[in-house]
From Swiss-Prot:
It comes from the Bacteria. It comes from Bacillus subtilis (strain 168). The gene is rluB. It catalyses: uridine(2605) in 23S rRNA = pseudouridine(2605) in 23S rRNA. PROSITE patterns: PSI_RSU, S4. This is Ribosomal large subunit pseudouridine synthase B.
Length: 244
């Protein structure tokens, strides 16, 4: 048996905290009866409704996608553009991305139907590292890379400390390849950080998420996470970097 709010969160209906609010507000029914107490536990045979809609309880699944450029990080798009879930049409579960990558950014993206798990991984307090490789205009000096590491002041505030490394440069074309590791998830953050130091991003790819990478995958490929990987991610979701 599991707590009702946990089952609702796992189904992707709402975060656990939001599920608790829905229960308190009398918007949740179990087997046709309104439940307002948070301590209620349910079994797999119990019928759950939220706001009059039946909660479909699915087996949790976890995938890693090598997202191509030109794809929306969403389960659907009202403009009819290609979305990341288009790569998973053969699975019965309704999955969605954990966080997002910009339309023009490629790289590692996780998808799941486990709402509570996704919400925890996206919470900034756990400081999960995400490593990007950017091709930028110009060749930034070491001082500008150190500025990236110390934090860049953006419109909504200063970014957290990061790690920056110059991987290669092309003096003839005046471009550089730079690796940047951050643990925040602001909108278009990496691109804006480079713009702030005067080096526009030409191409951007996320190569790592925590301990996961793209090894063995080509753009558009996906694989299911192993039980061990899921266990490690759960530890990160529960304890952040202190999990290991």
């Amino acid at each position: 048996m599991e707590r009702l709010q946990k089952v609702i969160a796992h189904a992707g209906v709402a975060s656990r905290r939001k599920a608790e609010e829905l229960i308190k507000e009398g918007k949740v029914k179990v087997n046709g009866k309104v439940v307002t107490e948070l301590g209620v536990k349910v079994t797999g045979s119990d019928q759950i409704e939220v706001n009059g809609l039946k909660v479909e309880r699915e087996e949790p699944v976890y995938f890693l996608l090598y997202k191509p450029r030109g794809v929306i990080s969403a389960a659907q798009d009202d403009k009819g553009r290609k979305v990341v879930t288009d790569f998973f049409k053969n699975i019965p579960q309704r999955i969605y991305p954990i966080g997002r990558l910009d339309y023009d950014t490629s790289g590692l993206l996780l998808l799941t139907n486990d709402g509570e798990f996704a919400n925890k991984l996206m919470h900034p307090k756990y400081e999960i590292d995400k490593t990007y490789v950017a091709k930028v205009k110009g060749i930034p000096p070491k001082e500008l890379l150190r500025k990236l590491e110390r934090g860049i002041r953006l419109e909504e505030g200063k970014t957290a400390p990061a790690k920056a490394k110059l991987l290669s440069l092309d003096k003839k074309k005046q471009t550089s390849i730079i690796q940047l590791t951050i643990h925040e998830g602001r909108n278009r953050q990496v691109r804006r950080m480079f713009e702030a130091i005067g080096h526009e991003v030409i191409k951007l790819k996320r190569e790592e998420y925590a301990f996961l990478n793209l090894r063995g995958l080509h753009t558009g490929d996906a694989r299911e996470l192993t039980p061990h990987e899921v266990k490690r991610l759960r530890a990160l979701a529960d304890h952040g970097k202190n999990a290991f």
